[in-house]
Curated annotation (Swiss-Prot):
Cofactor entry: Mn(2+)
Positions bound to Mn(2+) 2: C124, H269, H363
Active site: H438 (gmp-histidine intermediate)
Assembly and binders: Catalytic component of the tRNA-splicing ligase complex.
PANTHER family to which the protein is assigned, alphabetical: RNA-SPLICING LIGASE RTCB HOMOLOG
Full protein name: RNA-splicing ligase RtcB homolog
Lineage, highest ranks first: Eukaryota, Sar, Alveolata, Apicomplexa, Aconoidasida
Keywords, alphabetical: GTP-binding, Ligase, Manganese, Metal-binding, Nucleotide-binding, tRNA processing
Length: 515
């Protein structure tokens, strides 16, 4: 029988690091069977939110596990190395917390892959476009511009894409990713040079993706979708217009083509839609059925998993890669539609408007990477869920354009708050397996947001800030209000102070499209 600890007793397993700023260490014994420690990166204010969640659960256990328990349960999975890592935007999710990073040794035959460590919206991620426009150039036509974007980019649950696509096209999308969108005219050839993995995972195999998943994905190419992730509470999906408010690192920003306060940028956040959700759901069924056969013990049934080299593990990784390719194409088509919207309203070509991709990052993905573990270079399967790769300067897997500055990291804020561009660091490789935060992280559930926040008050606050808004559903106004989230600036500053990413640019929203 598992021993039950009081809240005060559980705190004895958590200590603050003397060596690394904003690091809390969760020692073995916090939950049963931990193979490694849990490492939480959070300042005192952000950590208090997670401790309060833990206390609430201890006093009154509910249907969800607090993020700290989930972090520790991941530390008990077979084959995990270094530590189970939670970033400052961590909050409770399905199996893994959102904001969790975990790596498994590819040379260990017991190591596992878990769909809960990626999430249901496989390769949900963010793409940033820059322009040569200043805010004064679009201010008189801002409403027209945001309406054109809203008209061209399908948003919301069940929305249908405008790109003609048959099952043959879909298989090519799943296999070739952005190479398909370049050949089909929906991407500029240079776009993929500024995408993580250059917009394609070569392990993808369309034949392992179920007919049901393909049917769901066929009509959703180039759609923004909605932000309700099954079994989890994540940031909503959006396409926002920003202006540069502050530049912290002028050299790095200039390399990215961002060099002026007031410069207009566009950020799109979306993923693999219903197709990725179905790939994850199918894999969970397979893995739940095989858990007894493989004799893998997990602390939480939501951590259903399979050995990496098992049939179930290989199938999931191939399907996840295919869904990731789909997500890159999805963001590419939305980039195409965004460029088209600007062209139609401003009567200039996207090329003349300098609408180049700054970068495209993944927030929910599993990848094979090489990292140092106990002084040895090891090949690992990295699970990043609600977290962002943050490789340092001169890392071989980042684009040539960014070798001197490190990988750009895109961190989205909420409906009325700023977003950030960061750069990766060597310390991230040492402390967080080359990872940093991805957003702000929810503090209120969607239901609670609708109960306690006033629709008109939220709209008025946005209006006072000069933010235009279009939403697929009115309920999103309260669900996605800034009050529902942690302070993204505090999250970003915590990562900056810990040295796992470096602040580069701050972006202020002037128009918001929510799905």
């Amino acid at each position: 029988m598992t021993k039950t600890y009081k809240y005060e007793d559980q705190l004895h397993f958590i200590q603050k690091s003397d060596d690394v700023k904003n690091l809390f260490i969760i020692k073995k014994g916090f939950v049963p069977n931990m193979n490694v420690e849990g490492h939480l990166f959070a300042n005192d204010n952000l950590s208090k939110l997670l401790f309060d969640e833990l206390k609430q659960f201890t006093d009154d256990p509910g249907s969800f596990l607090p993020a700290l328990k989930q972090l520790a349960n991941v530390a008990a999975l077979p084959g995990i190395v270094k530590s189970s890592i939670a970033l400052p935007d961590a909050h409770s999710g399905y199996g893994f917390s959102i904001g969790n990073v975990a790596a498994f040794d590819m040379d260990n035959c017991n190591s596992i892959v878990s769909p809960g460590g990626v999430g249901f919206d496989i390769n949900c991620g963010v793409r940033l476009l820059r322009t040569n426009l200043l805010y004064k150039d679009i201010e008189p036509i801002k409403e027209q511009l945001v309406q054109k974007l809203f008209d061209l980019i399908p948003v919301g649950v069940g929305c249908q894409g405008k790109i003609p696509c048959d099952y043959g096209d879909l298989d090519n999308i799943l296999e070739y990713g952005m190479d398909w969108s370049v050949c089909s005219g929906y991407s500029w050839a240079e776009d993929k040079e500024h995408c993580e993995d250059f917009g394609r995972m070569i392990q993808a195999d369309p034949t392992v993706v179920s007919y049901r998943a393909k049917k769901r994905g066929l009509s959703q190419i180039g759609t923004l979708g909605a932000g309700n992730h099954y079994g989890e509470v994540q940031v909503s999906i959006y396409s926002n217009i920003y202006v540069v408010e502050e530049i912290y690192d002028e050299y790095s920003a200039k390399v990215m083509g961002i060099d002026r306060i007031g410069q207009v940028c566009i950020m799109t956040h979306s993923g693999s839609r219903g197709l990725g959700h179905q790939v994850a759901s199918d894999a969970l069924v397979d893995m739940e059925n095989s858990l007894n056969k493989s004799k893998i013990k997990v602390n939480d049934k939501q951590l259903a998993c399979a050995r990496i080299n098992s049939d179930e593990g290989k199938k999931y990784l191939k399907g996840m890669a295919a869904a990731s390719n789909y997500a890159w194409v999805n963001r590419s088509v939305m980039t195409h539609l965004t460029r088209k919207a600007f062209e139609e309203v401003l009567k200039e070509s996207a090329d003349d408007l300098d609408m180049h991709v700054v970068y495209d990052v993944s927030h929910n993905i599993a990848k094979i990477e090489d990292h140092m573990v106990d002084g040895k270079l090891k090949r690992l399967l990295l699970h990043r869920k609600g977290s962002t790769r943050a490789f340092p300067p001169y890392h071989p897997l980042i684009s040539a354009d960014f070798q001197h500055i490190g990988q750009p990291v895109l961190v989205g804020g909420t409906m009325g708050t700023c977003s950030y561009v960061l750069t990766g660091t060597q310390l991230a490789m040492d402390l967080t397996l080359g990872s940093t935060c991805h957003g702000s992280g929810r503090t209120l559930s969607r239901n609670k947001s609708r109960r306690v926040l006033d629709y008109n008050e939220v709209l008025n606050n946005l209006k006072e800030k000069g933010i235009s808004i279009r939403v697929a559903s009115p309920k999103l106004v309260t669900e996605e209000a800034p009050e529902s989230y942690k302070d993204v600036s505090e999250v970003v500053q915590t990562c900056h102070d810990s040295g796992i990413s470096k602040k580069c640019v701050k972006l202020r929203p002037v128009a918001v499209i929510k799905g």
